[in-house]
């Protein structure tokens, strides 16, 4: 009888601890979602430039400068300011084939970048579900979150968040775009007014031997 009672006590204690952890993670998800939403409201008042470099087999092939801003609906838009390529353009049929291949590759890179951005701007519902399922550690002033199958089946994402502000320090992603595996790492900085923003992004698509680096610079607050 004593053994049964002891087992029941252990089960009840374990259940209570699990319940408390679930409640804590749910609240953490709400806190992070709130901080991220408030930060987004600050970020949409800025425009900036994005310096993008494309490397193939370790050699720089293209360098573009892009202006980025949010429209009146809060959606991110961009416009190419300049673009320099070291790839020699061929003529005739080969030239057209080269152009088509380049456009396909550009589309692939764009899709990988757009998917990476989605991991930055998650909705409150995603944050709550994420914290319910993910492995979460809070240590040394940081919240570390490891999750799988977040936005796509088989993806893996690792968030590091400042526990004092609930804003990002870094995000590392492993996912698939257009059927091709890729990795993406995003580092964040905080401006003098407290606005948190992606500062450096690196995307690698191994099957295409491509690496893309992106630096966000020259943030200007819109009037």
Where are the language model's segments positioned?
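Flexible, processing/modification-adjacent segments and terminal tails
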Residues: 24, 82-155, 175-178
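Bacterial N-terminal signal peptides
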Residues: 8-16
């Amino acid at each position: 009888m004593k053994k049964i009672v002891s087992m029941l006590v252990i089960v009840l204690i374990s259940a209570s601890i699990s319940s408390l952890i679930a409640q804590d993670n749910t609240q953490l998800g709400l806190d992070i979602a709130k901080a991220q939403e408030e930060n987004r409201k600050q970020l949409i008042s800025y425009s900036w430039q994005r310096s993008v470099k494309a490397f193939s087999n370790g050699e720089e092939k293209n360098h573009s400068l892009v202006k980025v801003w949010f429209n009146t609906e809060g959606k991110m838009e961009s416009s190419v300011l300049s673009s320099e390529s070291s790839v020699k353009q061929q003529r005739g049929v080969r030239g057209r084939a080269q152009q088509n291949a380049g456009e396909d590759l550009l589309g692939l890179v764009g899709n990988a970048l757009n998917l990476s951005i989605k991991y930055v701007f998650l909705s409150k519902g995603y944050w709550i579900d994420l914290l319910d399922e993910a492995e979460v550690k809070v240590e040394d002033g940081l919240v570390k979150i490891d999750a799988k199958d977040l936005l796509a089946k088989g993806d893996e994402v690792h968030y590091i968040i400042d526990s004092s502000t609930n804003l990002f320090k870094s995000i590392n992603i492993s996912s698939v775009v257009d059927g091709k595996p890729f990795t993406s790492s995003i580092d964040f900085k905080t401006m003098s007014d407290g606005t948190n923003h992606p500062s450096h992004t690196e995307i690698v698509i191994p099957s295409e031997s491509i690496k893309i680096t992106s630096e966000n610079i020259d943030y200007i607050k819109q009037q």
